[in-house]
From Swiss-Prot:
This is Formamidopyrimidine-DNA glycosylase. Belongs to the FPG family. A zinc finger (FPG-type) spans 239-273. The active site is at residues 2-3, 59, 263. Binds 1 zinc ion per subunit. Keywords: DNA damage, DNA repair, DNA-binding, Glycosidase, Hydrolase, Lyase, Metal-binding, Multifunctional enzyme, Zinc, Zinc-finger. SMART domains: Fapy_DNA_glyco, H2TH. One of its GO terms (molecular function) is damaged DNA binding. Its cofactor is Zn(2+). Involved in base excision repair of DNA damaged by oxidation or by mutagenic agents. Acts as a DNA glycosylase that recognizes and removes damaged bases. Has a preference for oxidized purines, such as 7,8-dihydro-8-oxoguanine (8-oxoG). Has AP (apurinic/apyrimidinic) lyase activity and introduces nicks in the DNA strand. Cleaves the DNA backbone by beta-delta elimination to generate a single-strand break at the site of the removed base with both 3'- and 5'-phosphates. Monomer. The keyword Heme does not apply. The keyword GTP-binding does not apply.
Length: 273
């Protein structure tokens, strides 16, 4: 699933191409990919409108259109939004095509979990998907103290807490594993057992892995590509994620893979306590 760095990379790459471009036609090839309005109403509402801005909130993209309309896009497991300068034949799993005044956006999703939701702009932050999100980890209002305050009542594993989007928005399996490794914290530790010193290590570790992920244009294993169809490079920098059974790059001990909060989790039992 695209996490904060991947979604931010998609936002930046789309912004290069579509701002002030007009939606001339929308082709909905699978109606289940769109939400908010019936298929024809959805298409009629946005036809002729320009993209004014693209923002990110957690793992969601928020597209502001003219006349008070917005798209909320969530890629979920395998969703992709790719810009094509010239008209392209849709792939098998391309569910929505936005034909613009210059170029096209193809919304493609092999597993059919991703969605494009049409909402009134003034109502979008009240949508349940966005209203429940925690703070953005890379914004000024978030700090080690705020992270500690939010972890204090959490009686669950710290890895599970980091995956909870109401705690902090945008962190998923990849960056949770990497942040915990950098902070030297075992993923099974109870969230409310972390000391002030440990939280002061975890907070910058979260920020660093997310910032480095963005700088590397995200992590690509299978499906993820940016809006230009290019893969990310952060998979080359991963210390633990996806490396269960391999030696730790810091101490040489064998990395352990467990199942935690329903997700595969990899950590070093020597470096993380």
């Amino acid at each position: 699933m695209p996490e904060l760095p991947e979604v931010e990379t998609i936002r930046r790459s789309l912004s290069q191409h579509i701002l002030e471009r007009r939606i001339e036609e929308i082709l909905i090839r699978w109606p289940g990919a769109v939400e908010g309005y019936e298929e024809k109403t959805f298409a009629d509402a946005v036809r002729g409108l320009k993209f004014q801005s693209i923002e990110r909130r957690g793992k969601y993209l928020l597209f502001t259109l003219e006349e008070g309309w917005s798209f909320i896009a969530h890629m979920r497991m395998t969703g992709r939004m790719v810009y094509h300068a010239q008209s392209q034949e849709p792939e098998k799993h391309t569910h929505v095509v936005l034909k613009l005044s210059s170029g096209e956006i193809h919304f493609t999703d092999t597993r059919k979990f991703g969605r494009l939701q049409l909402v009134r702009t003034e109502e979008r932050l009240q949508q349940p998907s966005l209203a429940r999100l925690g703070p953005e980890p890379l914004e000024e209002g978030f700090s080690a103290a705020e992270l500690g305050r939010r972890l204090a009542p959490r009686k669950l594993a710290i890895k599970a807490a980091l995956l909870d989007q109401t705690l902090v928005a945008g962190i998923g399996n990849i960056y949770a594993d990497e942040a915990l490794f950098r902070a030297g914290i075992a993923p099974e530790r109870c969230a409310n057992s972390l000391t002030k010193e440990e939280i002061e290590k975890l907070y910058p570790a979260i920020c660093q892995v997310l910032e480095e992920g963005i700088a590397a244009n995200g992590t690509s294993f299978r499906d993820y590509q940016d809006a230009n169809g290019e893969r990310g490079d952060f998979q080359k920098e991963l210390k633990v994620y996806g490396r269960g059974g391999e030696p730790c790059k810091e101490c040489g001990h064998t990395l352990v893979r467990i199942r935690l909060a329903g997700r595969s989790t990899v950590f070093c039992p020597c470096c993380q306590v």
